[in-house]
């Protein structure tokens, strides 16, 4: 009887430990951090104590940080030097680094994929060499600074292509050649161990869109093959389309894994604490989740469970939880942050990362 009494609590603790560490990557994108700090913003933990944001994240279960990298931004925001500085802090806090290469001087997304200044817009051979050399330069710079990189995404939300006009979706062979060149910029770099290479699309819930892109780019007759990349990343936002259900996300992730054999991650997602005037109806199987701090916890746990229950599902990243100067985060909702924008204090929802 005594043995059973002792064993049962141990089993409970073991099960809890396994449940709280089911995802390999429990992450956040905090690319804006250095810009926020330059504006005088300081962050507080849930107890109101001022601390570096990276330490607050780590204490709440975050183990990886996503960083967007721009090529030649006019003001230096998110350029290579900026990201080396941020990554050194991330590593010092004990978290891994995931670089999100935009291959642009500014935002890259389904509506914007502007080729950097000085890169070719009329010759694909020249452009692919520029992509290869730039990608290798980024990786080599991190290596020379002693910074390990866990993941490199070759493009950001590239369902509609990248590096326009040459990489528009009217020419999937060009897209494939660009991605192949980027992948080998990582592979031929001096980073050791080598990062995992990711392709990242938006609308992760839309299996037909995901399948269309990968089937076209892998059958274009160009250089890209499945062995060029390791991971498939998707964005999953609940406030842009009522069809973005959890059920649809589940189907899409499972199909991506079974069709292409890659590990899968949700690399951008958010949930609002305030959304008085949403531009679109929320998906039907999310309507029971309140727009609140508690709702953020519930939403992240549900998405994380879907990822964890997908064969090869290994990670979730929350997009910009602490960008207090941009609480809407580009959406029609008023506030998607896990840090209070007025007090700069971490909300209790931030601790959800310790549970996924």
UniProtKB/Swiss-Prot annotation:
Class of enzymatic activity (EC top level): hydrolase
Gene3D superfamilies the record matches: Glycosidases (3.20.20.80)
Intracellular or extracellular location(s): Secreted
EC number per UniProt: 3.2.1.89
Residues annotated as catalytic: 157 (proton donor), 268 (nucleophile)
Protein name, as recorded: Probable arabinogalactan endo-beta-1,4-galactanase A
InterPro entries named among the record's database cross-references: Glyco_hydro_53 (IPR011683), Glycoside_hydrolase_SF (IPR017853)
Principal subcellular localization: secreted
The gene coding this protein: galA
GO cellular component: extracellular region
GO biological process terms held by the UniProt record: cell wall organization; pectin catabolic process
Keywords from the UniProt entry: Carbohydrate metabolism, Cell wall biogenesis/degradation, Glycoprotein, Glycosidase, Hydrolase, Polysaccharide degradation, Secreted, Signal
Signal peptide: 1-21
Catalyses which reaction(s): The enzyme specifically hydrolyzes (1->4)-beta-D-galactosidic linkages in type I arabinogalactans
A GO molecular-function annotation: glucosidase activity
PANTHER family, A to Z: ARABINOGALACTAN ENDO-BETA-1,4-GALACTANASE A
Function: Endogalactanase involved in the degradation of plant cell wall polysaccharides, and more particularly of hairy regions of pectin.
Glycosylation sites: 133
Homology family: Belongs to the glycosyl hydrolase 53 family.
Natural source organism: Aspergillus fumigatus (strain ATCC MYA-4609 / CBS 101355 / FGSC A1100 / Af293) (Neosartorya fumigata)
